[in-house]
Amino acid sequence: MRPEEWTDLRFGWLKRYIYSSKWEITNLMIRDARQISEMEFEYYSDDYRPLNKGDMYFTPDGTAFIKADVDIPKELQGKELWFSLKTAAEICVKINGKYVGGVDPNRERMLLSPYIDDKKTLHFDMMGYNRSKPDDERNPESLSVRGCRQIFEGAYICTVNHKVQNLVWDFELLLDIAKSELFNEDYRNFLNKELNNAMNLIDFDSDELDGIDECQKYLDDVVFANDNYKGNGDVALIAHSHLDIAYYWRRIHAVQKNLRTVLIQLRLMDKYPDFKYTHTQPYVYETLEKYYPDVFEELKEKVKNGQ
């Protein structure tokens, strides 16, 4: 096995430790529907049914409403809490009457703590849409969890090990560079060597995953502080959304898709005051104001703040 392959393998192990703790929500209920206008739905059943891990859920071009009352376990009370749900659908999450965020194929986790006060009971109301075309049809092995019909893998209240998460982000960036032919071969060879050396500092056989701090310090000192491969100029990270009003979905679904997009950007703005975002279509502002006035007011405050 080449050093870079050994690094890749251990990077997969490292990602398993992002969550410090995970507590499964076991009382979820689901009701399937089909959207017939911007805010009207035709339900397939008269009532909700239980949603358990391993169940098939969602339908092509289908909507699902998911709910649960969750008592936060004592061992998690007072901690920074996250909600985790792996899904191929696009889900807007409301907790105790407030839209808190969203999950989708690109983000399985959303922060809860600043938005739930100190309440020990959380009422989840979720609305999800799954488009008519699989999210990733290139990989047949993933269709069971990323297709139009998918296997429910569970929903969790979690705590995050931020040291591990930060290290994962650093490795993700550097591994992408090391595998890209857009960068010169000397730099890529340097990265493959030093990423392997950094990963060697982590003891994956220890109960507490020893070596995280040492690995991070090695990356900071040897890779990020290295002047031999530095270029000139600044890098700007810019977020923009030009939402396809109709693509692999109908126009009426753009109302909820836009809500999720806006929610995710608002939460990034909450966390990163320097984060700026542009949303360029009048139609999506109009539907947000019409159907989700509370979120629209929150958006207006961000506009006032220059975000």
Predicted regions and their residues:
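Solvent-exposed beta-strand/loop surfaces of large extracellular or lumenal domains
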Residues: 44, 52, 88, 92-111
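Intrinsic-disorder/low-complexity, polar/charged segments enriched in Ser/Thr/Lys/Arg/Asp/Glu/Gln
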Residues: 63-69, 80-82, 121-123
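Short, flexible loop/turn segments at beta-strand junctions in immunoglobulin-like
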Residues: 74, 112-117
